[in-house]
């Protein structure tokens, strides 16, 4: 009985140490929430495939989204849809990296932004615990040059700390809790609605 307890204790301790070591070694976790995103998700994941960990949280995709995601990660989880803020926090809870990058399925990183993020997370000393990123949006294939989406900035890169999380908003969630905010020079691309039919579908989803 004592031997069995000792072996069980050693096994549990080993698993804990492995998990801690893995967490220590991971520099960056990427979190993505998805649903029926087969049109955009491959370009998104292709731009972050260099990350140490990719976490996918799906809320009931009926298209080929999950098949595409499996080409990039096995960390795929299915859940209900409580809204953007809660869903992103669920994905954040599963991340193990020192840094976290939250990216939407219809976004992707520029090559220069990839280099800048890699430089940021490799620094041994850094006073910032979160970074705002310029976002360049496209509507029906055209770059948006006016309105709220022009000169848009989103806080998406941040340290994985217990006091940093997303607001529990259904839409238009924000990151909260960071103390020192930096700003990256390079941009993330946002390929928003590509056709008028997508615009009408989005309006219907938000009004229902």
Residue ranges and their predicted role:
Residues 3-5, 10-13, 17:
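Short hydrophobic targeting helices and cationic amphipathic motifs
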Residues 16-46:
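N-proximal low-complexity "stem/linker" segments adjacent to membrane-targeting elements
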Residues 38-39, 47, 58-67, 104:
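A conserved acidic beta->alpha catalytic loop
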Residues 40-42, 63-72, 112-113:
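Acidic helix N-cap motif at the loop->helix transition within catalytic regions
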Residues 44, 51-60, 77, 105:
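Short beta-strand/loop segment that forms part of the nucleotide-sugar
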Residues 66-96:
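Conserved donor nucleotide-binding strand/loop of the catalytic core
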Residues 86-92, 99, 103, 110-208:
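Catalytic-site signature of metal-activated, phosphate-bearing donor transferases
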